[in-house]
């Protein structure tokens, strides 16, 4: 069944009492994120099939072919025996779209009907593939008091927070219409950081759309300053019971102020004060060398490491799927 009711969609995903994981659901399955994808020119289809909720993004391939991608989903809200069979049938035949070459999912749930989700997916005909989203993340339980959260951090991180306070670093969180006035500040700092570290970015419009998120899935821009000088910035997303640390950057030459560390600490405190239960650092990697510094930075704040099952493909058209993967290997 394709869903078209925003309140019902977010309500079922957020409020349903069956919570299979402390990191589910992800904002990538929110109604607002689907609408953001539409603004970027992609078609979105939202399914509720036997209690499996999936906001699926239609991705274009060559020769008029497509595939569907379900980031951090489907969200499991029931465990009926035939759920996965019915789920696949929904993508295989529908009046609103042509049959895709394959379906790619990245569920966060670890189990289904008491069995490891990996076993369930393999039995249903899915095959493992390279993850799109980071498989691992760090999550801080905000129900703990601030002192307990602070004590779980590395000594150098606690020192950096105290040093930033003594040196006069301030952090402001902007929401609603106020985000428009500071987005360019965030963008300059963010791009300076990515150029400095030779990191890839999406087009500017993507970050602008993220910054405009409002409602049940909303965003805030945080700016850290020394006096009137902005020296670090970040975008956070808020959905369900979690706050997500999504994008961040800092200016060169201001290292002694420890602004990125202090900004993140203030964001943790802000999320706790606002009533969120979890703070999600949004991705770490022990294998990717390019992620080593950011992973070490995030891990210095403590938190529990949680790993998801990764990405899985179900293939509807094997010849085209083979050509697609062969082309990806050749192109790199």
What are these regions (language model features)?
Residues 4-6, 20-22, 43-44, 60-62, ...:
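Active-site/acyl-donor-binding loops of N-acyltransferases
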Residues 78-124, 133:
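A gly/proline- and charged-residue-enriched helix-loop-helix capping module
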Residues 2-64, 107-112, 118-133, 137-256:
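A conserved beta-strand-loop-helix scaffold within acyl/acetyltransferase catalytic domains
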Residues 70:
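Flexible glycine-rich active-site/ligand-binding loops centered on an Asp-His dyad
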Residues 75-77, 108-111, 283-288:
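Short histidine/acidic/glycine/proline-rich micro-motifs that form metal-
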Residues 86-93, 208-317, 321-322:
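Aromatic (often tryptophan-rich) hydrophobic motifs at membrane interfaces
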Residues 96, 122, 165, 272, ...:
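Anion (oxyanion) recognition and catalysis
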Residues 103-104, 172, 280-281:
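Short catalytic-loop micro-motif centered on adjacent basic/acidic residues
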């Amino acid at each position: 069944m394709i869903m078209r009711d925003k309140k019902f969609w977010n309500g079922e995903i957020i409020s349903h009492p069956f919570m299979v994981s402390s990191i589910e659901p992800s904002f990538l399955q929110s109604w607002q994120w689907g609408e953001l994808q539409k603004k970027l020119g992609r078609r979105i289809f939202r399914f509720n099939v036997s209690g499996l909720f999936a906001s699926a993004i239609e991705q274009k391939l060559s020769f008029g072919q497509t595939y569907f991608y379900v980031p951090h989903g489907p969200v499991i809200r029931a465990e009926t025996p035939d759920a996965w069979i019915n789920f696949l049938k929904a993508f295989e035949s529908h009046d609103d779209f042509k049959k895709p070459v394959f379906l790619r999912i990245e569920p966060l749930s670890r189990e289904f009907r008491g069995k490891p989700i990996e076993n369930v997916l393999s039995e249903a005909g899915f095959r493992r593939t390279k993850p799109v989203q980071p498989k691992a993340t760090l999550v801080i339980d905000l129900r703990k008091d601030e002192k307990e959260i602070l004590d779980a951090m590395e000594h150098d991180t606690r020192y950096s927070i105290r040093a930033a306070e003594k040196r006069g670093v301030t952090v402001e969180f902007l929401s609603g219409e106020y985000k428009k006035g500071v987005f360019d500040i965030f963008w300059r700092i963010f791009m300076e950081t990515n150029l400095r570290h030779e990191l890839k970015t999406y087009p500017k419009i993507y970050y602008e759309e993220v910054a405009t998120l409002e409602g049940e899935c909303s965003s805030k821009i945080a700016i850290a300053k020394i006096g009137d000088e902005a020296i670090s910035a970040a975008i956070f997303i808020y959905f369900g019971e979690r706050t997500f640390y999504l994008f961040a950057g800092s200016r060169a030459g201001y290292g002694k102020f420890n602004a990125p560390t202090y900004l993140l600490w203030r964001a943790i405190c802000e999320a706790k004060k606002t009533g969120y239960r979890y703070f999600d650092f949004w991705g770490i990697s022990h294998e990717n060398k390019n992620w080593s510094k950011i992973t070490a930075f995030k891990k210095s704040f403590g938190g529990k490491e949680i790993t998801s099952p990764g990405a899985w493909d179900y293939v509807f058209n094997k010849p085209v799927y083979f050509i697609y993967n062969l082309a990806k290997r050749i192109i790199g």
